[in-house]
């Protein structure tokens, strides 16, 4: 989760949820009586319209402040539904539902922020890894870090590479790649970068991404842009490259843990649990290292109030376990669903029976 703006003296925090986990955190933070602001599309009537014809209004973007009456999870989509009455904006006094999805900013205003709510937002924010963007073209590389306040260009690498007919072109390109890779490794270590996106025009970006993977064992996501330099970095951000890189890495992490789950099941290892009853028991013992919950199972639990699933998540969080809401859009998520929609890797085995 990204904290966009925070002013506790004025009682508000503006956030940008980036994953389903972030929606889970917000579900526990937003409560009845809070005031939530969001940019919504709402039908606005034209008061100047002729009275002879009925004006149904046109849907326009409006910034609304809604006094919360209820918060629920949409059963058929990965989104929160925040229901309430409009206090700020057109048609004050009308009921409205703010649908919160990943990538949608909301401002939460409370009379008083409880410590547990601040800690939950801080926890969600800390789980947001830094992303490095690299715009590359022949002999020119620009490196940027995506920070909370925006893009920070941290390095530029230039190297004289001969034209296509130059005899030393290939050798000089390799020298350039090595120099750029050295900078990437140095900055990634300093910044704690987990995701790298390489973009640029032409084929150089793909060649460099392959070089990083084969020569330096550094995985990178590739994005096509119309330009290199800082303009290329900005273009990557506008095209949603950061969000895609984080999501792809998240799926890779889910797959890694699920592979380990099935590996332990196959070996008869007792440091694994699956199914609601077993996972709840493991959570109560404080034995869970990683808890994996299928997104469909999680939605159903929130909508239908399936306490065993919600308690397994709550107890796992309290004991420092990593909790992942797993997409069932990929094969391994489907396999998790076959295990009852919930599984856990354990720190230690728990008593049976």
Swiss-Prot record:
Organism: Methanopyrus kandleri (strain AV19 / DSM 6324 / JCM 9639 / NBRC 100938)
Pfam family of the protein (one): eRF1_1
Subcellular location: Cytoplasm
EC number: 3.1.-.-
Keyword Translocase on entry: no
GO cellular component, one term: cytoplasm
Record key words, sorted: Cytoplasm, Endonuclease, Hydrolase, Metal-binding, Nuclease
Keyword Transport recorded: no
Family: Belongs to the eukaryotic release factor 1 family. Pelota subfamily.
Top EC class for this record: hydrolase
BP-aspect Gene Ontology terms: nonfunctional rRNA decay; nuclear-transcribed mRNA catabolic process, no-go decay; nuclear-transcribed mRNA catabolic process, non-stop decay; ribosome disassembly; RNA surveillance
Function: May function in recognizing stalled ribosomes, interact with stem-loop structures in stalled mRNA molecules, and effect endonucleolytic cleavage of the mRNA. May play a role in the release non-functional ribosomes and degradation of damaged mRNAs. Has endoribonuclease activity.
GO molecular function: endonuclease activity; metal ion binding
Cited InterPro entries: eFR1_2_sf, eRF1_1_Pelota, eRF1_2, eRF1_3, Pelota/DOM34_N, Pelota_arc, Ribosomal_eL30-like_sf, Transl-rel_pelota
Phylogenetic classification of the source organism: Archaea, Methanobacteriati, Methanobacteriota, Methanomada group, Methanopyri
Subunit structure: Monomer.
Matches recorded under NCBIfam families: pelota
UniProt comment concerning the protein's domains: The N-terminal domain has the RNA-binding Sm fold. It harbors the endoribonuclease activity.
Record-given protein name: Protein pelota homolog
Cofactors named for this entry: a divalent metal cation
Main location: cytoplasm
């Amino acid at each position: 989760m990204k904290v966009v703006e925070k002013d506790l003296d004025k009682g508000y925090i503006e956030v940008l949820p980036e994953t389903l986990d972030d929606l889970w955190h917000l579900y526990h933070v937003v409560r009845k009586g809070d005031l939530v602001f969001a940019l919504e599309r709402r039908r606005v009537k034209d008061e100047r319209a002729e009275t002879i014809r009925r004006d149904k209004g046109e849907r326009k973007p409006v910034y609304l402040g809604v006094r919360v009456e209820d918060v629920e999870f949409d059963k058929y989509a990965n989104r929160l539904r925040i229901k309430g009455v409009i206090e700020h904006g057109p048609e004050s006094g009308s009921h409205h539902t703010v649908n919160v999805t990943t990538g949608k900013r909301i401002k939460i205003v409370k009379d008083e922020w409880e410590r547990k709510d601040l800690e939950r937002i801080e926890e969600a924010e800390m789980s947001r890894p830094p992303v490095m963007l690299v715009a590359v073209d022949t002999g020119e590389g620009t490196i940027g870090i995506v920070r909370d306040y925006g893009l920070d260009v941290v390095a530029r690498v230039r190297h004289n590479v001969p034209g296509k007919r130059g005899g030393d072109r290939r050798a000089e390109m390799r020298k350039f790649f090595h120099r750029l890779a050295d900078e990437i490794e140095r900055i990634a270590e300093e910044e704690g970068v987990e995701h790298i996106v390489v973009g640029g025009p032409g084929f150089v970006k793909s060649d460099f991404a392959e070089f990083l993977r084969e020569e330096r064992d550094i995985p990178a996501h590739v994005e096509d842009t119309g330009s290199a330099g800082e303009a290329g970095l900005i273009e990557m951000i506008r095209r949603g490259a950061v969000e895609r890189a984080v999501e792809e890495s998240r799926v890779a992490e889910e797959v890694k843990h699920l592979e380990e789950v099935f590996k332990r099941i196959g070996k008869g290892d007792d440091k694994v649990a699956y199914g609601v009853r077993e996972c709840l028991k493991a959570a109560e013992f404080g034995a869970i290292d990683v808890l994996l919950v299928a997104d469909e199972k999680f939605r159903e639990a929130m909508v239908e109030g399936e306490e065993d699933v919600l308690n397994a998540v709550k107890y796992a969080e309290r004991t420092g376990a990593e909790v992942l809401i797993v997409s069932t859009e990929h094969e391994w998520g489907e396999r998790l669903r076959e295990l009852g929609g919930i599984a856990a890797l354990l720190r230690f085995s728990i008593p049976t029976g």
